[in-house]
Amino acid sequence: MVVHALVREDGTVEGGELYEVAGLLGMTDQQVRLCVKRLVTEGRFTVAGRGRRAVLRLTGAAGPAGAAGPGLPLVPEVEFVRHAYRQDGGLEPWDGVWHAFAFAVPESARAARDALRDTLTALGAAPVQGGLYVTPNAIGPYVRARAAELGLPESLSCLSTRDLAVGGTTDPRALAARLWPLPEIAARYEALHALASREAGAAEGPVAGLARAVALAAAFSAAMVPDPLLPPELLPQPWAGATARAAAAAAWDRLAGAAPADGPRLFRLYGEALA
């Protein structure tokens, strides 16, 4: 992730900067060398030169210079990040509707079945029982599109209701606490908040600023990617996610303001996500 985070708009990574930033993040030179070797072997980067004098270049296999690239969990989907901030600002109130998705797929199509299940969980839906998932968010268009891609449109059933009961639980907040691991989600955001709230040292230079940006991006993704983005109406208040996202946005503004004009594309990608 450190290597990808330091890719500049022209698709290159300077070896000296990579080793310095990685060192500040606790990585050894040997770990950096092994990481670079793996990325080159996988065809994600080419490299010219050796060690700190090397220049790495992103290949087409790693995606265009304006995108995060396969296997790079740096920037969660911009649309969902913006939705989270709108929720925090009270601009996306819950309408009280639950959205349920059920599917029955034979073992012969196991790979497609697993892919559909992974899509549902990635979109924040929680399993209720075998083949049945539920969420308070209107993710139907995404789920139906994915089912069609997988050749499973006839295997998917969709339903919306204001009357959901799971094992006798009907209260919306109680259902949220039952179906989603809220303490685990909150803990990831608490870690993000702690990192985002740290003040930079007075003598902090550009390399240290880059290291802080990479660490903040990693913590933001670690918290946001598995977050089902439940509406505030279903969450304990104050919610750790809203507090952490506000702190992260403020920290990112500070870091981006001090970043060099030709700095890593990471600043643009996160700037777009938080805009």
Give residue spans per PLM region.
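Positively charged, polyanion-binding regions of nucleic-acid-associated proteins
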Residues: 1-9
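Short acidic, hydrophobic short linear motifs in intrinsically disordered regions
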Residues: 12-22
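Short, hydrophobic-biased segments on the C-terminal half of alpha helices
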Residues: 33-37, 117
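Glycine-centered, phosphate/nucleic-acid-interacting loop/turn motifs that mediate DNA/RNA or nucleotide
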Residues: 43
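Short, Lys/Arg-rich nucleic-acid/phosphate-binding segment
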Residues: 49-55
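Short, amphipathic alpha-helical interaction segments positioned at domain boundaries
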Residues: 63-98
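Mid-protein regulatory/catalytic core that forms ligand/cofactor-binding pockets
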Residues: 105-199
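C-terminal regulatory/effector modules of DNA-binding transcriptional regulators
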Residues: 170-275
